[in-house]
Amino acid sequence: MINITLPDGSRREFESPVSVMQVAQSIGAGLAKATIAGRVDGQLVDASDVIDHDASLRIITAKDAEGVEIIRHSCAHLVGHAVKQLYPEVKMVIGPVIAEGFYYDIYSERPFTPEDMAAIEQRMQALIAQDYDVIKKVTPRAEVIEVFAQRGEEYKLRLIDDMSDDITAMGLYYHQEYVDMCRGPHVPNTRFLKAFKLTRISGAYWRGDAKNEQLQRIYGTAWADKKQLDAYILRMEEADKRDHRRIGKAQDLFHLQEEAPGLVFWHPKGWSLWQVVEQYMRKVYRDSGYGEVRCPQILDVSLWQKSGHWDNYQDAMFFTESEKRTYAVKPMNCPGHVQVFNQGLHSYRDLPIRYGEFGACHRNEPSGALHGILRVRGFTQDDGHVFCLESQIESEVTAFHQQALAVYTAFGFDDIQIKIALRPEKRLGDDATWDKAEAALRSALGVCGVEWQELPGEGAFYGPKIEYHLKDAIGRTWQLGTMQVDFMMPGRLGAEYVDENSQKKHPVMLHRAIVGSMERFIGILIEHHAGAFPSWLAPVQVVVANITDAQADYVDAVRKTLANQGFRVSADLRNEKIGYKIREHTLQRVPYLLVVGDREKENGAVAVRTRSGEDLGTMTVSAFIERLQAEQAA
C-alpha cells in the first residue's frame, strides 16, 4: 500500500505506485484538470511522475507561485517548438525562467526581427490551440546524445558534455515533434500556456562571453490567466515610461556607448544628481562616525589570494600587468580597508573603528546581463567597514539598520522588506563560525523589532548578510543595502587588535552599504520618481525665464541670488515664447519655473509655477528662497 498525506493532514491509500495526476483524479475532476505538478516530500515533480513510497503531496496549480514558474518554463519550450517549425535551420541553446517571465537563446545566421517575433507568437498560439499533451520521458544519457545529434542540436550536445558524469539519465520533454531536455517539471498540457506574450528580442553571447558566437534571445512573459497578463502589460507600459535610459536621454543625464560596455558617461545634469546623492551619503558617514578613506584601484593579485577573492571571485575580476606583476582591478573595497586598519596598533578600547569610501569597483559582468546603469561593469559604492568586537556586533548592526531606514525614507521609499542571506555552498570558514555570524544578525534584527525572511544559500562567500529590499512606485522590488558579518577576512589579511589581556586577536569585520552601487541607485531613483525628483534632489531645481529681453538682467540677478544660496538654478534667456519655455521645462521635470515680466522686475518679485502646472502666484525672491529651503530641510 502507498499512503499519500495531503496538506490538510488527510490520507489516501493506493494499492500500487501512483502518479501525482492519479492522486488528483482521486480527489476530484476539477482538481485533476487544474493540476500542473506536485510537490512530493518537498520536491517539485511532474504531474506524470509516479510516487512509489509513502509520501506527503501538495498538488501544484496555477494559483501557486510554483505553478506560474512552471508555466513560464513550459512557455520557453513552446518558443522552441514554434521557432523550429518556422525556422528549422536554427539551433536551440537554453530557455530558463527569469523574474516574471522567461527567455530562449537561439543561434541563428540572421538576426530575428520584430516581424519574426510576431510570427513566432502567432505560431505559439496556434500550437496552444491544438491542446496537446506535453510528454516526459526519462532517457539514458547516451540516448539523449543520440536524439540531439540526429537533430543537429550542437549546443544541446555541448551542454550535455558539460554535465557531471554522475548524470546518467535526464528528462526529455516532447512537444509533439519538438523535444527539449530539462530537469522540469513542466505543464502536462498546452492549455495552461494561453496567458503569454513575447516581449522583446536582444543579442546574447554563448556562455555570456563576447569572444563566443552571438545568439538571439527571445524574451517573454506568462501568467496563470489573462487578467494577470493584462495587469503585467499595464505595469510594463508604465515601467517603459519610467525607463531610466529613456529619461536619462530626455533629461540629458548620461549616456552609454559600445566602446565602453557597462561604463557610464555622466553629463553635467546627471553628475549634479550624482553629487547630491553622494554628498547626502557623505553626511551619513560623518554623522555615523565613519572616517572617509580612499584606496587604490588596482592591487597585486597576492592580496586577493589572501582575502579569498581569488578562489571565489576571479571570474568576475579584471586584470592588468606591469613589470611582470599581475594586478587585479578591485571588484570590492574590503581588502583595501583592511590595509588601512593594519597601519598601526589598535587596542580593544579603540574599537569600533569605522571606515567609509565612495569606492570605484569593476566587475566583469556578462555582456548579456548589462542593462543601462542598473547593471554595469564599473560602479561606485557607498561602501563602509566596521572593525569591532563580537560584543559590539549587535549595537553596530542596530545603528546601521536605523541609518538605512532613514536614508530610504529621505529618498522616497517607505515599503521595505528585510531578508537574511545565509551560508552559500561555496564559502570560507567552518560551520561553527557561520552559526555564530548568522545568530548575530538574527539577534540584532530581533532587537530592532522587525520581521525578516531567510534566504538559504544566498550569503557572500565570507559571511551572511542582511539585505534591504525596497518596493518602488509601481510595485517592483529592488535589493539595495546590505550588512554582512565577516569573521574570516580579518584573519586572512592579518587584522589584529590587542585585547584587555594584552593578547592579539582578530576583530570582527562588518561590511555595509546603504545605497550600494551609486549608478544602480540613481537608475532606481529615476524610475521610482519617473524623473520628477523631489526639489532637494533634482539636478536643476529652478529655472528662471524672461518674457522679453527687457528682463534679462533681472533674470540673471535672480539666478545669481539663488545660486549664492546653494541652489541648482539656470536662466532661460532664449528668444522663445514663454509658453514654449514653460512646456519644455515642464517636460524636463524641473520642480520650479520662475517667470519674470516687467511687473515682476519692477516689484523685485517672481511668478512661481510648479512642474505639475500649479500657479503659486507672485512672491518675493526671499519668500521663494524660504520655500525652497524648507523643502531642503524636509
From Swiss-Prot:
Entry protein name:
Threonine--tRNA ligase
State the needed cofactors, names only.
Answer: Zn(2+)
Please list where the region (Catalytic) is annotated: 243-534
| Family note | Belongs to the class-II aminoacyl-tRNA synthetase family.
Q: Which reaction does it catalyse?
A: tRNA(Thr) + L-threonine + ATP = L-threonyl-tRNA(Thr) + AMP + diphosphate + H(+)
Q: Which domain of life is it from?
A: Bacteria
Domain named TGS: residues? 1-61
Q: Which residues form the signal peptide?
A: none
> Which Gene Ontology biological process is one annotated for this entry?
threonyl-tRNA aminoacylation
The record, for PROSITE patterns, names: AA_TRNA_LIGASE_II, TGS
